[in-house]
Amino acid sequence: MNLQLFHLPLLLALALSGPAQAHETDSPSGPLGTVSFPTSCDPKVQPAFERAVAMLHSFWYSAGEKTFREVLKDDPGCAIATWGIASILMSNPLAGQGASAKGAEQAQAAIDEGRRIGAKSERERDYIEAVATYYKDFATRPEKDRQVSRAKAYEALAQRYPADDEAKIFFALYNAGTQTQADQSYAAYLKSAGILETQFRKYP
């Protein structure tokens, strides 16, 4: 991933100061950066899939969801695209608001579809199950509990695939989302910043 184009210094500042601004309705313009996210999908949809992941990183949620859905339409066997849809529908993890009830319903439908399709690789299945932890028992769990479950799932994902920089970056983002105002040590923010700083040194 070209992290510089994803404004990593800005993400670090956001982690230390406040929630990022999500682009819910706008269309992306300018460079989104590059993503390397290997999949078992048809090679013809790989560029669009990686562009959708770039949109997810850049908080371009409406355009990203549309692109993930187009990928799934063009390759109905691309189960990992359902992970992208469910991830987009969680909304901005740094804002603390989480998915809407309608978004959660749509996300669960996407997750169920991904499970039905069956990802061709264990890594892709693990990504789908990681995002699924956030939506489990959605109606009966508070947002903070969902955020903690999500962070733990992505931490496990990053540990299981130590060469997967995407897993590390998503864990850093979701871990930052667990920071509370009561914790004046800012442990979650600092841990996430450390992960992202390592990635920035790797991809200056």
Features from the language model and the residues they span:
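Bacterial N-terminal signal peptides
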Residues: 6-17
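N-terminal secretory signal peptides that target proteins for export/translocation
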Residues: 1-4
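Sec/Tat signal peptide C-region and signal peptidase I cleavage site
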Residues: 18-22
